[in-house]
UniProtKB/Swiss-Prot annotation:
Role of this protein: Catalyzes the addition of sialic acid in alpha 2,8-linkage to the sialic acid moiety of the ganglioside GM3 to form ganglioside GD3; gangliosides are a subfamily of complex glycosphingolipds that contain one or more residues of sialic acid. Glycosphingolipids are required for convergence extension movements during early development. Can catalyze the addition of a second alpha-2,8- sialic acid to GD3 to form GT3. Can use GM1b, GD1a and GT1b as acceptor substrates to synthesize GD1c, GT1a and GQ1b respectively.
Gene: st8sia1
Active site: 310
Residues reported to bind substrate: 154, 176-178, 262-264
Protein name: Alpha-N-acetylneuraminide alpha-2,8-sialyltransferase
Length: 345
């Protein structure tokens, strides 16, 4: 415990300054502990989490302050998805993941957008569910489902073997176009199986970055037309590239250096503006849990992400600072303890 991690004890847990200064104070404290922008390793991060302890208290002042920052930079209530209101006919829509590529909005494309933001805002309590292996055996399913609005990322499995840990309810699920290409052959031959697999997400919004890269447009449009042809009760929303671009700039200014943010961080960013309270699950980018046990990368498999695309430890650090300052709650331990493993009193 005398490693550099012991310097964490110099950072106070409570009585932080109020307003936007509190988060800045935490960042300065972290830079003192890890000078030269050295990211903490797994063991150091575990010490930090365990030192902070299980207690968490929301800070309404900090919540409102951070929500205003997101509103000023990115306007999620208005720009989260493409709508007829925010995307006029004839607009030159620039893709956020391609240099110098744009699409002129015509009647055909604009007809795919809802009239306005479909959510009744503000949303109350939101669960944002990442897919991290730390969710396995977490028994967080019931707690996740208690939220008013549940966001999930990239079509995660919700079969019976996982529901105790991740729940069953979904109000919004994201779909990376690469999933449509690799798993469903771009819906050229697998439309029926795709529709059947999406039934587990019930009457949810399906959120896709159709206008981020040229390669993502066709698969996203195929999803829209497939769900329409089969008369499903799901609604496709297309991510607004202006929103994605601005969120990327927002986090880059706060020290996240990556080619692209993870889907999870995009969703958390949206939730912090759209929801009154946010709890996040499955956000833990390390190979061992808080008890020192090895865990898989996802709760359902151990497929690793492409190297060099995301900066998951940097993202986690920012989310952890928001947890400490009371802006959001990060669930890293079991939601329900395993009674069979506890000693009788």
């Amino acid at each position: 415990m005398k490693l550099q991690g012991s310097r964490m004890w110099l950072c106070p847990r409570t009585r932080l300054p109020v307003g936007a200064s509190a988060l800045g104070f935490l960042i300065l404290c972290w830079l003192y502990v890890f000078p030269g922008y050295r990211l903490p390793g797994h063991k150091e991060m575990v010490r930090e989490v365990l030192r902070f302890g299980p207690g968490w208290r929301k800070n309404r002042t900090e919540m409102d302050s951070f929500r205003k920052l997101l509103q000023d930079c990115c306007d999620p209530p208005h720009l989260f998805s493409l709508t007829k209101v925010n995307t006029p006919l004839g607009e030159n829509l620039w893709f956020d993941g391609e240099f110098f590529h744009s699409l002129t909005i015509d009647n055909s494309t604009r007809s795919l957008f809802p009239q306005d933001t479909p959510f009744k805002l503000p949303l109350k309590r939101c669960s944002v569910v990442g897919n991290g292996g730390i969710l396995k055996n977490s028994r967080c399913g019931e707690q996740i489902d208690e939220a008013d609005f549940v966001m999930r990322c990239n079509l995660p499995p919700l079969s019976r073997e996982y529901t105790e840990d991740v729940g069953t309810r979904t109000q919004l699920v994201t779909v990376n176009p690469s999933i449509i290409d690799k798993r469903y052959q771009n819906l050229l031959w697998s439309r029926k199986s795709f529709v059947e697999n999406l039934r587990v997400y019930q009457q949810s919004y399906v959120y896709m970055p159709a206008f981020s890269t040229k390669r993502g447009t066709d698969p996203s449009l195929r999803v829209y037309y497939t769900l329409a042809d089969f008369g499903t009760n799901q609604t496709v929303l297309f991510a607004n590239p202006n929103f994605l671009r601005n969120v990327g700039k927002f986090w880059k200014s706060r020290g996240i250096h990556s080619k692209r943010l993870s889907t999870g961080l995009f969703m958390v960013s949206a939730a912090l503006s759209l929801c009154e309270e946010v709890t996040i699950y499955g956000f833990w980018p390390f190979q061992m849990d808080l008890g020192g046990r090895y865990i898989s990368h996802h709760y359902y498999d151990n497929t690793l992400p492409l190297s060099g695309v995301h900066a998951m430890p940097e993202e986690f650090l920012q989310l952890w600072l928001l947890h400490k300052s009371g802006v959001l709650q990060m669930q890293l331990d079991q939601c329900k303890k395993d009674v069979s493993s506890q000693k009788p009193h």
